[in-house]
């Protein structure tokens, strides 16, 4: 089980990896293809983010797999209830994965 200090450190490490990812050509290309389309973000950006997170959690004893990331997230969620800083860092990670997108123009015609 992660300690509070390890939880904070691991989330800071993930944030660093995500910031590096955002500067990469692959991420920027995917982002330019997405625009405000959340479905495209899930298809193109989310896999890049998950891969970066899986690689980051290996430094804290978890495997670079969906199972390892799931176990890590379970432990972080448990810590977030005990530690406000872990909760804040989790929120920051979440906002990097799914940033707020501007609402579509209300006057634009909706596709049928």
Label the model's feature ranges.
Residues 1-112:
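Terminal, compositionally biased segments used for targeting/anchoring and flexible tails
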């Amino acid at each position: 089980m992660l300690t509070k200090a390890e939880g904070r450190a691991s989330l800071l490490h993930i944030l660093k990896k995500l910031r590096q990812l955002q500067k990469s050509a692959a991420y920027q290309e995917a982002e330019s293809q997405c625009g405000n389309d959340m479905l495209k973000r899930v298809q193109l950006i989310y896999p890049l983010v998950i891969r970066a997170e899986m690689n980051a959690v290996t430094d804290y004893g978890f495997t670079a797999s969906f199972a390892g990331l799931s176990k890590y997230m379970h432990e972080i969620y448990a810590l977030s209830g005990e530690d406000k800083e872990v909760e804040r860092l989790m929120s920051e990670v979440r906002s990097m994965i799914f940033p707020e997108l501007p609402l579509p123009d209300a006057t634009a015609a909706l596709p049928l």
